[in-house]
Amino acid sequence: MAIILNEMLKKSFITALLLLIFSVLRAQDGTSAFQFLKLPFSAHASALGGENISIIEDDLTMAVQNPALLSCVADKTLNLNYMLYMDGVNVGGAAFARTAGERSTWAITAQYVDYGELKETTEENIETGTFSAKDISISGIYTYDLSDYWSGGVRTNFIYSHYDKYSSFAIGVDLGLNYYHQESDFSASLVARNLGGQLKAFEERHEKLPVDVQLGFSKRLSHAPFRLSLTLHDLTHWSASTTAANNFGKKLLNHIALGIDFLPTNNFYLAAGYNFRRGEDMKINGSSHWAGFTCGTGIQLKRLKLGM
C-alpha cells in the first residue's frame, strides 16, 4: 500500500510541476524586481558557471539552488557564507537543516545583500546626499524522497527590499525535482524558481519576480575523477540578452552554463565553469569572452566544509 501511495505521490508531483512550468513559460515577459534572487547562494554553484541545480553532495547551499537536493544533506547541518560581490556590496547568508523521518528533510535559510552607502544625485548629476540599500530573504525548504531515484522539494521565500525611502515585500516559491541514479552517478533536475509576486510594491505599480525555469544534468565519469555538468537556465526568457542573438544556436548558448569538477577524493574538489550569457553580456568593445569563466575549490575537514 505504501509503495502505491508513493508512486501516486511521485506522479502527481511531477505532473503538477510540469503543468505549472509550461504555464509559466507561456506567461512570462517584461522586466522584474528583486534581481538579487538570481545571485547563487552556493559557492560550488558559483564555480560551475554560476548556475547548477544537479550536483549530488552533502551541501546545504545547493538546496537553495534546487530544493529537491535537500534530501542529500545530513541531519543538523549548519551553513554560514559570505561573499564580497562587487566593490562595497556585501552578500551573506545562513542555513540550518534537519531530517524528519526516513524520507523528509526541512531547512531554514536567510540571505542579505548590503549595498552600503550610495550617492543620491539629481537628474543633472548634482550630488545631494547618500542613502542605504539592502535586500533580505528568509525561506523554509521541505523535501520528500518520492522513491529511491526521485525527490521533490519546495521552498517558500519571504523577500524584503529597502532602497532609501522605498520598500517592498514579496513571497516567492521554488519547486524542484531531482532524479539520481547512484550506480551510474547520473543526476537530472528540473526547477521553477521565484513563482509568486509582490504584496507591497515600491510605488504604485506591482512588479514581477525574476521567474527562472532551469533544467540541469550532472554525470561523474566512471574511470576518471571528473564530474561534468550542464545547466539550461532562464528558459522563461528565451531572447533575453544585452546583445543581439538572431539565430537559434546563439540564443541556445545564452542559456547554457557548463561545469566540470575534479574530485581526487571525497573531501576535496576543484571546479571550473563557463556561462555563455555572462561571457556575451560582459565583453567590452570586442574583447574576449573570459568574463564567462568561473572557478573555485572546496574541502571538507571532519565536520567542517569550506568552499570558495
Regions from the language model: what does each represent?
Residues 1-11, 148:
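Positively charged n-region of N-terminal signal peptides that target proteins for export
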Residues 1-5, 23, 60, 188:
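Generic secretory/membrane-interface signal
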Residues 7, 26-28:
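Extreme N-terminus of proteins, especially the signal/transit-peptide cleavage junction
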Residues 10-18:
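Sec-dependent signal peptide recognition
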Residues 18-26:
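Hydrophobic h-region of N-terminal signal peptides that target proteins for export
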Residues 28-308:
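Subset of outer-membrane beta-barrel
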